[in-house]
From Swiss-Prot:
This is Large ribosomal subunit protein uL15. Transmembrane segments: none annotated. Binds to the 23S rRNA. Residues 14-54 are annotated as: Disordered. Part of the 50S ribosomal subunit. GO terms for molecular function: rRNA binding; structural constituent of ribosome. It comes from the Bacteria. Residues 21-37 have a biased composition (Gly residues). One of its GO terms (cellular component) is cytosolic large ribosomal subunit. The gene is rplO. InterPro entries: Ribosomal_uL15, Ribosomal_uL15/eL18, Ribosomal_uL15/eL18_sf, Ribosomal_uL15_bac-type, Ribosomal_uL15_CS.
Length: 148
């Protein structure tokens, strides 16, 4: 299954809400915006964390420390079981081969191999990272796990 093959589940798509078209439609007069005030006006959006002008919580509390979360690199992952489902003619597996087979996005140059599933044939797999179980399964099947 690929992204362009997805279909909506029955009942997931609703008719659009026609607001301001008379009281009989159920969304007339205030168009579902409640009474008067800032949030009833057009263009109104209050930024997250705004508390009406009082000193917000995120400014009351001290900020300490630093982490690398924003600078992490997320690698696309492929399981050993997915490698087993590749064409029989493929003996060397790289990121380009996986992209051509639709297992990772086109243009991805690095990949991590994880150990879910079984592998029955010898493959020469080149990847940036391997889990320990994936490396063991590839080598047990007679293949090579090469870290790029």
């Amino acid at each position: 299954m690929k992204l362009h093959e997805l279909k909506n589940v029955k009942g997931a798509v609703h008719r659009k809400k026609r607001v301001g078209c008379g009281e009989g439609g159920g969304h007339g007069k205030t168009s579902g915006r409640g009474g008067k005030g800032q949030t009833a006006r057009s263009g109104s959006s209050i930024r997250p964390g705004f508390e009406g002008g009082q000193m917000p919580l995120y400014r009351k509390l001290p900020h300490r420390g630093f982490n690398q979360y924003n600078f992490r690199t997320e690698l696309p992952v492929v399981n050993v079981g997915d490698l087993a489902s590749l064409d029989a003619s493929i003996t060397e597996v790289t990121a380009e081969v996986l992209a051509a087979q639709g297992l990772i996005r086109a243009g991805e140059t690095s990949v991590k191999i994880l150990g879910d599933g079984e592998l029955s044939r010898a493959l020469k797999v080149t990847a940036v990272k391997f889990s320990e179980s994936a490396k063991a399964k590839i080598e047990k099947a007679g293949g090579q796990a090469i870290t790029a």
